[in-house]
From Swiss-Prot:
Catalysis performed (reactions): 5-methyltetrahydropteroyltri-L-glutamate + L-homocysteine = tetrahydropteroyltri-L-glutamate + L-methionine
Binding-site residues, Zn(2+): H636, C638, E660, C721
List of residues binding 5-methyltetrahydropteroyltri-L-glutamate: R15, E16, L17, K18, K114, W555, E599
UniProt keyword list: Amino-acid biosynthesis, Metal-binding, Methionine biosynthesis, Methyltransferase, Repeat, Transferase, Zinc
Residue numbers binding L-methionine: I425, G426, S427, E478, D593
Protein name per Swiss-Prot or TrEMBL: 5-methyltetrahydropteroyltriglutamate--homocysteine methyltransferase
Gene Ontology annotations of biological process type: methionine biosynthetic process; methylation
InterPro entries noted in UniProt: Cbl-indep_Met_Synth_N, Cobalamin-indep_Met_synthase, Met_Synth_C/arc, UROD/MetE-like_sf
CDD domains: CIMS_C_terminal_like (cd03311), CIMS_N_terminal_like (cd03312)
Task of the protein: Catalyzes the transfer of a methyl group from 5-methyltetrahydrofolate to homocysteine resulting in methionine formation.
Cofactor binding note: Binds 1 zinc ion per subunit.
Cofactor or coenzyme needed: Zn(2+)
Positions annotated to bind L-homocysteine: I425, G426, S427, E478, D593
Lineage: Bacteria, Bacillati, Bacillota, Bacilli, Lactobacillales
């Protein structure tokens, strides 16, 4: 009986880590109190995993901010600007993730990128010319010792050296090969220390191997591991992969002197085929059979069919990836049992892994019978009218006329905006008062009339403030919305909403993805009321703010009984109806956010178009294809790497696109120029995910850099994302500087 998981959620059952850490950020508790609370949380989580009967428990999967950042700190991959800050280790650690602005200095946060095809974001380390890779941290050892004191001999988890190098940035003139020997020495020192502490096995996460690999990348991988595994310091090595299959290196991988290999049998298209072709008898196979990214119950019969085909003798059942990507437990939900029985969050997935192992070993007949019964019953019916509407779509439904160049001229005449028009991405700070009023309204303590009056007053205040500082295109602030997906889902059929289904997105920020239960249609107008109200309060244009269909799908837990393409088209038709209602209400600039467009892009380039972009881009076009030429369509995208899909983004046929660029040093601009990008662009001129306020002249320099790459007539000036999570003082100070910088830049044109 051998079972494990790749990793466990770390925010806590009720987001305890988030709230404690935020108290620390506000200086309400000490560093010692934060560390003590985190220690208690780790003990609680280890105990849950143990009590569920999981036989191998991981450690060091916990993080105060991000596991990739933990590895950077462990191996001294820290910029000199942060190394030199006169701060504690923990303060420097947080400075890397959040930036630091205070009496000890002023440093920007490191860039942040999507973690493969998930909604989790990792902090991107940077190798500089003087970076000295060495063992500098002790977290992995401390947490192993903590668990040992609780009577648990855990398996420490660490990002592998290949993935670390592949996903990091490098200063000009610096390359990954420069650090092979120093990384090998540092990892071997980790091995030795863990062995001395009594560890028997370490898990090295090498998810980068599921992507397309060049000959040079394969050579780097083999060079690293041939050297590293030459001396394992008496420790067994589990080579763990997830998010896909390792077809490019499988033959090499099985011949490396590792002791165990973890493979993904959920998302790995070719994993079963590879293993059936042969797996070494002297190695243990960790079978990722329970989906770590979705919340539906595992179909035991289907999983057992896969397990029966695996020829390996030594098997450990595990999750397909870390359970970080699903909520904590269904125990705190209020769904009817008929609904709840279909869901498995992190704690319930422990049960599933244990059940499958028991069934495989001739036990667990009751669990198998109950699971069969669950899947034998039809879960939900279909909407025949909606299915017919989709079946009737033609190419014309995906094509906006006239073409972009003609629309651009029409809109220039219609809006008469200045050069370098200024705007924001949509949301303004959601203060304690805003959240308290929303909660009171939900509880029935505030009437509809009272709540509407509060929202109107708040919108009025921010519309006037935007006019006072002379923004060109305004937003209403989204004060009525709790979340950019849940708010829409609450007005769509086919959606369910958890009470406590939080999932970590970046740092201490959690999101609560809704669940797509059935067919999706719009129940009523969603945004028209407040967007049209805001427009009535000013003569300047106010953007209508919508979330696009691909993002709504990608930031929800999708159905598994129909394709994500079909689900997305259903959502697209619902949002299309909303776009047309906004236009009819006099809202002439409509932003359709596709923040998560890249999120489900297949990790292998050969699958990009056929499996995703060939339907995701048309789904966006479907939403806006029938608006008038003088209605301007904006879209926005968040932290992702877009440079390799620029033609697809241009093909969305929006009129303006804004995107994150500040943390990544505007690298995307070179690609826009090279690809002759036609859509007008708003590269984010400052990073809103850090509380840091841009220095005097900082935004001016960013605008200057943008104008060196993009014609001024194509450029908009905006922050890189919405301002919902920021405080009012820092928001206003930053936006005043943004408007001033835009005006100064206009003077130079």
């Amino acid at each position: 009986m051998s079972t494990t998981i790749i990793g466990f959620p770390r925010l806590g059952e009720f987001r305890e880590l988030k709230f404690t850490t935020e108290k620390y950020f506000r200086k309400e508790i000490s560093e010692e109190e934060l560390l003590a609370a985190a220690k208690d949380l780790r003990a609680k989580h280890w105990n849950i995993v143990k009590e569920k009967g999981i036989t191998e428990i991981p450690s060091n999967d916990f993080s105060h901010y991000d596991n990739f950042l933990d590895a950077a700190f462990l191996f001294n991959v820290v910029p000199a600007s942060v190394q030199n800050l006169d701060l504690s280790d923990l303060e420097r650690y947080f400075a890397l993730g959040r930036g630091y602005q205070g009496e000890k200095g002023d440093v920007r946060a490191l860039p942040m990128k999507k973690w493969f095809n998930t909604n989790y974001h990792y902090i991107v380390p940077k190798f500089e010319k003087d970076t000295q890779v060495k063992l500098a941290g002790h977290k992995i050892f401390d947490e192993f010792q903590e668990a040992k004191e609780l009577g648990l001999n855990t398996r420490p988890v660490l990002v592998g050296p290949f993935t670390f190098l592949q996903l990091s940035d490098f200063e000009e003139g610096v390359k990954a090969d420069d650090f092979v020997d120093s990384f090998v020495a540092a990892y071997q020192e980790v091995f030795a220390k863990l062995a001395d502490l009594g560890a028997t096995r370490i898990q090295l996460d090498e998810a980068a191997l599921v992507k397309d690999l060049t000959a040079e990348e394969k050579a780097l991988f083999l060079n690293l591991y041939n050297k590293l595994l030459a001396d394992k310091k008496g420790l067994e090595v589990l080579f763990q992969t997830y998010f896909g299959d390792v077809r490019d290196v499988y033959a090499d991988l099985v011949n490396l002197p590792v002791d165990a290999i973890g493979l993904d049998f959920v998302e790995g298209k070719k994993t079963l085929e590879l293993v059936k072709g042969g797996f070494p008898a002297d190695k243990t196979l960790y079978v990722g059979i329970v989906n770590g990214k979705n919340i539906w119950r595992n179909n035991y019969e289907k999983s057992l069919t896969v397990l029966e085909q695996i020829p390996a003798e030594n098997i450990v059942l595990t999750s397909s990836c870390s359970l970080l990507h699903v909520p904590f437990t269904t125990a705190n939900e209020e769904f009817e049992p008929a609904l709840l029985n279909h869901f498995a969050f992190a704690v319930e997935k422990l049960d599933e892994i244990r059940d499958l192992d028991a069934i495989r070993n001739g036990q667990g007949s009751e669990a198998l019978a109950a699971n069969k019964e669950l899947f034998a019953t039809e879960r939900v019916g279909e909407n025949a009218e909606l299915r017919a509407r989709i079946a009737g779509l033609t190419d014309a439904d995906y094509t906006r006329l006239p073409a972009f160049a003609e629309r651009e001229a029409i809109q220039e005449e219609a809006f008469k905006l200045p050069a370098l028009p200024t705007t924001t991405i949509g949301s303004f700070p959601q203060t304690k008062e805003v959240r308290a009023k929303r909660l009171a309204y939900r509880k029935g303590e505030l009437s509809q009339k009272e709540y509407d009056a509060f929202l109107a007053e708040t919108i009025d205040e921010w519309i006037k403030w935007q006019e006072d500082i002379d923004f060109d295109v305004l937003v209403h602030g989204e004060f009525e919305r709790n979340d950019m997906v849940e708010y829409f889902g609450q007005n769509l059929s086919g959606y369910l909403f958890s009470k406590n289904g939080w999932v970590q997105s970046y740092g201490m920020r959690g999101v609560k993805p809704p669940i797509i239960w059935g067919d999706v249609t719009r129940l009523n107008p969603i945004t028209v009321k407040w967007s049209s109200y805001a427009q009535s309060r000013t003569n300047k244009p106010v953007k209508g703010m919508l979330t696009g269909p691909v993002t709504i799908l990608n930031w929800s837990f999708p159905r598994e009984d129909i394709s994500i393409k079909d689900s997305t088209l259903q959502i697209a038709l619902a949002i299309k109806d909303e776009v047309l209602d906004l236009e009819a209400a006099g809202v002439k600039i409509i932003q359709i956010d596709e923040a998560a467009l890249r999120e489900k892009l297949p990790l292998r380039r050969s699958d990009w178009y056929e499996d995703y972009l060939d339907w995701a881009i048309p789904a966006f076009r479907l939403v806006h294809s029938t608006v008038a030429p003088d209605t301007q369509i904006h879209t926005h995208m968040c932290y992702s790497e877009f440079t390799d899909i620029i033609p697809a983004i241009d093909n969305m046929d929006a009129d303006v696109i804004s995107f994150e660029a500040s943390r990544s040093n505007l690298e995307i601009l070179d690609e826009l120029k090279a690809k002759n990008f036609q859509t007008e662009v708003g590269p984010g001129v400052y990073d809103i995910h850090s509380p840091r306020v841009p220095n005097e002249g900082e935004i001016d320099n960013t605008i200057e850099a943008i104008l060196a790459k993009v014609p001024s007539k194509k450029v908009w000036i905006n922050p890189d994302c919405g301002l919902k999570t920021r405080g009012i003082p820092e928001t206003k100070e930053s936006l005043i500087r943004l408007v001033e910088a835009a005006k100064a830049a206009r003077e130079k044109l």
